[in-house]
């Protein structure tokens, strides 16, 4: 897997201000404001920064949190995790393995079969509808 490395200026030129804040500065969009939290269409969710496939709609569920939630990544090799001690909490941060974009966090309160909840910012994702993803 080839890493994608860009300067801060290159990321700022490529991304919207919100995408840049979330993915490059480890920000979080407000709950229930992202464009994908309630998306029920079939398709593929990829990294907004580099296009790496991350999640499929089949593993997305309504966690009631206001962020897109998935119980499993498409390919575990496409994400990486780091311990996050920010904001006085201990969490596990989820990042894109290719470009190091901050995606969100993973929690151990998800549904079967994994028991995991990948709580991901909409601003970190690009959605490709199933009809377009299969062509």
Swiss-Prot record:
A GO term from the CC aspect: cytoplasm
Residues covered by the MsrB domain: 8-130
Enzyme class: oxidoreductase
Cofactor(s) the record lists: Zn(2+)
Residue ranges of the TM segments: none
Enzyme Commission number(s): 1.8.4.12
Reaction catalysed by this enzyme: L-methionyl-[protein] + [thioredoxin]-disulfide + H2O = L-methionyl-(R)-S-oxide-[protein] + [thioredoxin]-dithiol
PANTHER family documented for this protein: METHIONINE SULFOXIDE REDUCTASE, METHIONINE-R-SULFOXIDE REDUCTASE B1
Protein name: Peptide methionine sulfoxide reductase MsrB
The species this protein was found in: Thermosynechococcus vestitus (strain NIES-2133 / IAM M-273 / BP-1)
């Amino acid at each position: 897997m080839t890493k994608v490395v860009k300067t801060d200026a290159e990321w700022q030129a490529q991304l919207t201000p919100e995408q840049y804040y979330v993915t490059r500065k480890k920000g979080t969009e407000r709950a229930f404001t992202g464009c994908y939290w309630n998306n029920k269409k079939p398709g593929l969710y990829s990294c907004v920064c580099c296009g790496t496939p991350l999640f499929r709609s089949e593993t997305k569920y309504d966690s009631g949190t206001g962020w897109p939630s998935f119980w499993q990544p498409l390919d575990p090799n496409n994400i990486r995790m780091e311990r996050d001690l920010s904001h006085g909490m201990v969490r596990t941060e989820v990042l894109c393995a290719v470009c190091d974009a901050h995606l969100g966090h993973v929690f151990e309160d998800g549904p079967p079969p994994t028991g995991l909840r990948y709580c991901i910012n909409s601003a970190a994702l690009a959605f490709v509808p199933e009809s377009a993803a299969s062509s």
